[in-house]
């Protein structure tokens, strides 16, 4: 899988720009605040339907525009595809594949497979559970459209259930209706948690092997799923569903007092360890960055094995964060992957030959070759 070109109209600081790419290594370089990351953002938008930097589409619109358009030409084992995303302020995004509008954003998932690695990814380790859930959800949504739909439905049910818990405070006759939402939530939760458990187990196996190579066998990396529901068997959705309902019943009074749902996939987490120690609490900055590199390389391997396609790799200003050894390890392991690297100094890569390196200089929202 590779991207041939992307067209940006009124997207961030790009007025009207067509950018062609190499199938191999694309070095996007230039001074800060010129628009390098905006290219990465536009590619990721075409993969996931959303920006990795903001949840507000209005922030993607050029200061002189009233909307934006992104058109991406893609080649995969399924043939050529055109992904187009159009947005006008005050209206919903329109997503098209080969000029056919999609009824649901979920239909975009899996058409362009992408792995993104940016300095902000350190939050996966340093911050709370929501960042870690977001990481696995982004990958799983690309691999399994059904997971995207389950997650979307779960969030709707969760919102409705929380509203009901608040209404019950002054409408006690609504208490009996809570059971209906419990069963809906349990059904969706069982599928989401089973999928997450399987994915995290696979992620752990692969990233552990990669990390051992990266650290010359000195660090054993572990990833452990920590669901908010106390479960012994995460492989059986039916058992998860029954146990989920039982635990909801056991905390009913507490939830009614707090007016919020206290268990479910929205409170899941997973722990990362090095040699048995919590990476967030005890890992050095270097260990945390190396662990992230192992995670991202494992993500690429999982996507490839699940889809028989190499994803595109988006490296946004991370090469300067890695030391020479880790930088070389990364470059050696992505030779067959179309890669986009943003940086201020192209000299880091001038001695590297991937067969078809392309250097793209960015200045004030314009690109030069």
Swiss-Prot record:
Q: Which GO terms describe its molecular function?
A: ATP binding; single-stranded DNA binding
Domain of life where this protein originates: Bacteria
Q: What is its main location?
A: cytoplasm
Locations listed in the record: Cytoplasm
Q: Which SUPFAM superfamilies match?
A: P-loop containing nucleoside triphosphate hydrolases (SSF52540)
Record's keyword terms, sorted: ATP-binding, Cytoplasm, DNA damage, DNA repair, DNA replication, DNA-binding, Nucleotide-binding, SOS response
One Pfam family, short name please? SMC_N
Q: Which GO terms describe its biological process?
A: DNA replication; DNA synthesis involved in DNA repair; double-strand break repair; SOS response
Return the similarity comment. Belongs to the RecF family.
* PANTHER family hit by this protein: DNA REPLICATION AND REPAIR PROTEIN RECF (PTHR32182:SF0)
Instruction: Report the protein's function.
Output: The RecF protein is involved in DNA metabolism; it is required for DNA replication and normal SOS inducibility. RecF binds preferentially to single-stranded, linear DNA. It also seems to bind ATP.
Q: What is this protein called?
A: DNA replication and repair protein RecF
The organism encoding this protein is Acetivibrio thermocellus (strain ATCC 27405 / DSM 1237 / JCM 9322 / NBRC 103400 / NCIMB 10682 / NRRL B-4536 / VPI 7372)
Q: Which gene codes for it?
A: recF
């Amino acid at each position: 899988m590779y991207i041939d070109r992307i067209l940006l109209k009124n997207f961030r600081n790009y007025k009207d720009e067509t950018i062609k790419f190499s199938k191999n290594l694309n070095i996007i370089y230039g001074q800060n605040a010129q628009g390098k990351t905006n290219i990465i953002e536009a590619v990721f938008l075409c993969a996931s339907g959303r920006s990795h930097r903001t949840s507000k589409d209005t922030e993607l619109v050029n200061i002189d525009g009233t909307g934006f358009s992104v058109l991406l030409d893609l080649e995969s084992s399924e043939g050529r595809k055109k992904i187009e995303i159009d947005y006008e302020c005050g209206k919903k995004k329109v997503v098209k594949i080969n000029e056919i509008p999609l009824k649901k954003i979920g239909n975009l998932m899996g058409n362009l497979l992408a792995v993104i690695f940016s300095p902000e990814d350190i939050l996966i380790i340093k911050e709370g559970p929501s960042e870690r859930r977001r990481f696995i959800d982004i990958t799983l949504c690309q691999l399994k459209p059904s997971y995207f739909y389950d997650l979307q439905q779960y969030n709707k049910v969760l919102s409705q259930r929380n509203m009901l818990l608040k209404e019950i405070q002054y409408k006690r006759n609504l208490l009996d209706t809570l059971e209906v939402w419990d069963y809906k939530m349990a059904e969706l939760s069982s599928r989401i948690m089973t999928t997450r458990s399987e994915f995290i187990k696979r992620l752990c196996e692969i990233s552990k092997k990669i990390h051992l190579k990266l650290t010359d066998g000195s660090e054993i990396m572990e990833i452990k799923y920590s669901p908010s529901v106390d479960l012994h068997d995460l492989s059986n959705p039916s058992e998860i569903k029954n146990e989920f309902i039982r635990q909801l019943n056991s905390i009913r009074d507490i939830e009614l007092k707090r007016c919020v749902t206290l268990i479910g996939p929205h409170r899941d987490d997973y722990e990362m360890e090095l040699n048995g120690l919590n990476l967030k609490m005890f890992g050095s900055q270097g260990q945390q960055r190396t662990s992230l590199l192992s995670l991202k390389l494992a993500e690429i391997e999982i996507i490839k094995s699940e889809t028989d396609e190499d994803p595109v790799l988006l490296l946004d200003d991370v090469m300067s964060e890695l030391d020479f050894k880790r930088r070389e390890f990364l470059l050696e392991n992505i030779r067959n992957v179309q890669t986009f690297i943003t940086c201020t100094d192209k000299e880091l890569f001038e001695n590297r030959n991937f067969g078809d390196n392309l250097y793209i200089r960015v200045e004030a929202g314009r690109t030069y070759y």
